[in-house]
Amino acid sequence: MILFSKMHGLGNDYVVIDESAQECIPEDKKPEFVREVCTRGFSVGADGVIFVQPASGEGDIRFRIFNADGSEAEMCGNGIRCFSKFVYDNAIVRKRRLEVETLAGIKTVELEVEDGAVVSSRVDMGTATFKTDQIPMDVEEYEFIDRFLPVEGEDIKLTALSVGNPHAIIFVDDAEGVDLDRLGPAIENHPLFPERINVHFVEVVSPSEIIMVTWERGAGPTMACGTGATASVIAGVKLEKLDDSVLVHLPGGELKIDVYQDGTELGAYMEGDAVMVFDGILLRDP
């Protein structure tokens, strides 16, 4: 039997498994386990699986996240908010300022607590890079900002960047009118992105407000994407389309993104909530 919790951040839903005291799923079995558990209709169903693990020494606790297809992601904005609430509410680490180890480096999470439970969190998402070799992107250009990419017989103007994981940002007039099921996977799996990429279509309502729809790498269409919201606002600031404080409307709810300057680079804070849905037991061997 495997104990788990089901959580979501703006409808981006996850199975959370506590491995802070002992390993529940062997490393070599994690991808297969994730694919099985995330399959809707046949198991719990989720956009991904989060594992809570002990820190290696640099942080308070370690965050690992796997996409529904079994691939491991570097970072996830909605996922880290769920993770932080789980860690605090279950007294695994009882700090209101968490230093969380991720594959994208240490992320600082500040928790707002009421009646002993986390109600909101603010995450320092760190700085973005537009360097194509760090996204990565298989092109000769140093950066790919507001450039055309041939996709499905049309030229799509996009900006590529990484905020610890890769994102393609496409500014459009009507985000909700985009043919996401056609363009999303075509861009995600484009040969210029050797590690695939998260895809976001962004409509600018005003310099302080956007609407965003997402096709996530390894998960498909999702209700929200925290790193994607962060990347979209940073790209908008870079292109002088947006102010440095932006409300992001997603199918699952809203996030607030505040961009800051760190030397020559742009970073951002992401603020939003996370919800505990239920606890459960998987009646299977790991």
From Swiss-Prot:
* Function field: Catalyzes the stereoinversion of LL-2,6-diaminopimelate (L,L-DAP) to meso-diaminopimelate (meso-DAP), a precursor of L-lysine.
Q: Which Gene3D superfamilies match?
A: Diaminopimelate Epimerase, Chain A, domain 1
Encoding gene per record: dapF
Family designation: Belongs to the diaminopimelate epimerase family.
Please give the chief subcellular localization of this protein: cytoplasm
HAMAP family (alphabetical): DAP_epimerase (MF_00197)
Query: Which residues are noted in the entry as substrate-binding?
Result: 12, 67, 77-78, 165, 198, 216-217, 226-227
SUPFAM superfamilies, per the entry: Diaminopimelate epimerase-like
Q: Which GO terms describe its biological process?
A: lysine biosynthetic process via diaminopimelate
Assembly and interaction partners: Homodimer.
- InterPro entries from the entry? DAP_epimerase_AS, DAP_epimerase_DapF
The pathway that the record names for this protein is: Amino-acid biosynthesis; L-lysine biosynthesis via DAP pathway; DL-2,6-diaminopimelate from LL-2,6-diaminopimelate: step 1/1
Note the Pfam families from the entry: DAP_epimerase
Q: Which GO terms describe its molecular function?
A: diaminopimelate epimerase activity
Name the chain's protein.
Answer: Diaminopimelate epimerase
- Site feature location: Could be important to modulate the pK values of the two catalytic cysteine residues: 167, 216
